[in-house]
UniProtKB/Swiss-Prot annotation:
Pfam families: DHHC
Enzyme superclass (EC): transferase
InterPro entries: Palmitoyltrfase_DHHC, PFA4/ZDH16/20/ERF2-like
Record keywords: Acyltransferase, Cell membrane, Endoplasmic reticulum, Golgi apparatus, Lipoprotein, Membrane, Palmitate, Transferase, Transmembrane, Transmembrane helix
Lumenal topological domain residue ranges: 1-2, 89-95, 215-255
GO biological process terms, semicolon-separated: positive regulation of innate immune response; protein localization to plasma membrane; protein targeting to membrane
Name the record gives this protein: Palmitoyltransferase ZDHHC4
Entry similarity comment: Belongs to the DHHC palmitoyltransferase family.
Location of the motif Di-lysine motif: 340-343
GO terms, molecular function: palmitoyltransferase activity; protein-cysteine S-palmitoyltransferase activity
Function statement: Palmitoyltransferase that could catalyze the addition of palmitate onto protein substrates including the D(2) dopamine receptor DRD2, GSK3B or MAVS. Mediates GSK3B palmitoylation to prevent its AKT1-mediated phosphorylation leading to activation of the STAT3 signaling pathway. Also catalyzes MAVS palmitoylation which promotes its stabilization and activation by inhibiting 'Lys-48'- but facilitating 'Lys-63'-linked ubiquitination.
Coiled coil spans: none
Domain remark text: The C-terminal di-lysine motif confers endoplasmic reticulum localization.
Length: 343
């Protein structure tokens, strides 16, 4: 099986897995499948190996650990090293526009600034000194956020839209999610930084993908490879087709082809997640609220949820105040005075 077919299967498998996770993430089916697979594996693997894996997974996903942050920087460094070493040099020889070739470095500079801000900024840690103030920022919807609920770990009243992060072991104001890639929670005070970081990361991956593909296409055009012929396995001359051309380019520029494949997949994944993050920002939701929304409504209204004759109920998002105000709140966190203006 040639390289093109294998690479196509790899891309298709990866994208299908991501789509399946996105589709079933709000249901119990995926969890049941994962737990069932884990139980099957547990029966055939030694106890010592299971304990080692559990310890490793706990360290990586249930404690603040810089492993994913280091992996993020390593992958980003490798991508830019390959871009600088080969793609940039070859594109200069083919007389590409210099501003276009420098654009990935501009995006990298901006990305690193907002990456640092996302990592280092307090996401909105709730403490005894600020809990009374934060309790006044958002109204309680009495569905996902009951008025008198307390955090059993921090022993503090829980402001609306807050959540206790088990990884960081703290309650976070307007909690969105814990991001292992920045080793920090995403909350009220760093969501804006996170969005710009995600936007520039997506743009840099897409720009490198476009420039790498443009280099290969111009190389094919300059070399007139489509007009060449080759000998097949039966000794007959065949016109160069797309499959043969890709394999030829892979043999001639293997690192660039791998780079192109990686950044294409990365661009698609990041673009999908960026669209989701922008949707949440435009509707003034957090990832935590989006994930919990349907389940919280079903718990609060069991008769409505399970009665076949009842009309379907929709959980109203009381925190959305229009597109412009919602986006403004992402970059300028809401305050008690902000809430009063909206009344």
């Amino acid at each position: 099986m040639d390289f093109l077919v294998l690479f196509s299967f790899y891309l298709a498998f990866l994208l299908i897995c991501v789509i399946m996770i996105c589709i079933f993430t709000k249901s119990q089916r995926l969890k049941a499948v994962v737990l069932g697979g884990a139980q099957v594996c547990a029966r055939v693997t030694p106890q010592c190996f299971q304990r080692a894996v559990q310890t490793l997974l706990h360290q990586l996903f249930h404690t603040r650990h810089p492993a994913f942050l280091a992996l993020h920087l390593l992958l980003q460094g490798l991508v830019y090293a390959e871009y600088t070493y080969e793609v940039f040099s070859y594109c200069r020889e083919l007389e590409f526009s210099l501003p276009c070739l420098l654009l990935p470095y501009v995006l990298l500079s901006v990305n690193l600034v907002f990456f640092t801000l996302t990592c280092s900024t307090n996401p909105g840690t709730i403490t005894k000194t600020n809990v009374l103030l934060l309790l006044q920022v958002y109204e309680f919807d009495e569905v996902m956020f009951p008025k008198n609920s307390r955090c059993s770990t921090c022993d503090l009243r829980k402001p609306a839209r807050s959540k206790h992060c088990r990884v960081c072991d703290r309650c976070v104001h307007r909690f969105d999610h814990h991001c292992v890639w920045v080793n920090n929670c995403i909350g009220a005070w760093n969501t804006g930084y996170f969005l710009i970081y995600l936007l520039t990361l997506t743009a840099s991956a897409a720009t490198i993908a476009i420039l790498s593909a443009a280099f290969l296409l111009r190389l094919v055009a300059v070399s007139n490879l489509y007009q060449e012929t080759y000998l097949d396995d039966l000794g007959r001359f065949q016109a160069v087709d797309t499959g043969f051309l890709i394999q030829h380019l892979f043999l001639a520029f293997p690192r660039i082809i791998f780079l192109l494949g990686f950044v294409i997949v990365l661009s698609l994944l990041l673009a999908g997640y960026l669209c989701f993050a922008l949707y949440l920002a435009a509707t003034n939701q957090t990832t935590n609220e989006w994930y919990r929304g349907d389940w919280a409504w079903c718990q609060h209204w069991p008769l409505v949820a399970w009665s076949p004759s009842a009309e379907p109920q929709i959980h109203q998002n009381i925190y959305s105040h229009g597109l412009w105000s919602n986006l403004q709140e992402v970059f300028i966190p809401a305050t008690p005075s902000y809430k009063k203006k909206k009344r």
